[in-house]
Amino acid sequence: GMDHLDLFKPETYEFVDALFREYLEGRNPVFTGKRVHIGTDEYSNKKQDVVEKFRAFTDHYIRFVEGFGKQACVWGALTHAKGETPVKSENVLMSAWYNGYADPKEMIKQGYDLISIPDGYLYIVPAAGYYYDYLNTEMLYKEWTPAHVGKEVFPEKHKQIKGGMFAVWNDHAGNGISTKDIHYRVFPAMQTLAVKMWTGKDCTVPYADFNSARMAISEAPGVNVAGRIGTEPRSVYNLETLKPGMETGLKEIGYHYTVSFDIKAEAEEKGTELFRSPDAVFYLSDPASGKLGFIRDGYLNTFNYQFYPEETASVTITGDEKSTRLYIDGKLKE
């Protein structure tokens, strides 16, 4: 397809070689860790000549990144792309995501080390309607370990299963999901898998206790991407009257938030701001339509509501990681 590299053209290798060199060589390389993931996944297997080219491409870039002292990582695809062209397996780390693409038993037999990342358990695709919006952390905590690769179950602590991970795929741009929304999906998954990587099947703390305790753990020292203020819901800022240029002293207030204010509207020019933070701007009159709206992550989101001059209203805006709602005089507008 148009989004695939043409494996039959020498120019493809020239381009990808140069790309990896740009990231791997020189005095200040981008990739400084021990491993480099070369990708290689989801090519059609309808034509055997394509399969053989795919296998040759995979083998080439395994050896290419090894030439920079890196361990190569690949996506599991070699059951789907079954062929005669040899692909190096020694000291290669394979992401085992779907057993139909890479049979984990066969891959282990061939000598690959595996990272367990079965898509049916560990794929997040935010607000897409397929895979998970949020991982089922309770099921993962109670039932899953890296030894469970899809429906295949291996002995715990198998020497060729090096661990597990989850994935977030942002398949749909412009669907309202922000980087903050993704963070709220990622962090509980990260906390849960961290425990599972450490304890395996030997979790002794009940899930309810773990789930409660994890909420009190900060993201990292000095880090608060979620914008939490304390651990309990409470009012964090009250003011009788707002004046232009006033600052709250708060960087941000994370989900689940409620902002309420009374307003007597005037005719506003398009682009008139009401609130601003490092992450978003809320408009009384957005730059495009003159309606209430907000911009974040480069996207303008507009409510189908516009104040008329001299209108008085009580306005409430609520937000969580799935939606932002507008209430006028206590009634949900959008």
Predicted regions, residues:
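Flexible, acidic glycine-rich loops studded with aromatic residues
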Residues: 84-92, 98-239
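Short tryptophan-centered beta-strand motifs in secreted/extracellular beta-sheet-rich domains
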Residues: 259-261, 310-319, 324-328
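Active-site neighborhood of glycoside hydrolase catalytic domains
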Residues: 2-91, 97-110
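Extracellular glycan-recognition modules
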Residues: 234-295, 323
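Short, aromatic/His-centered strand-loop micro-motif at the edge of beta-sheets
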Residues: 292-314
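Short strand-turn-strand beta-turns centered on an Asx-Gly dipeptide
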Residues: 297, 327-331
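Flexible glycan-contacting loops in extracellular carbohydrate-active proteins
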Residues: 334
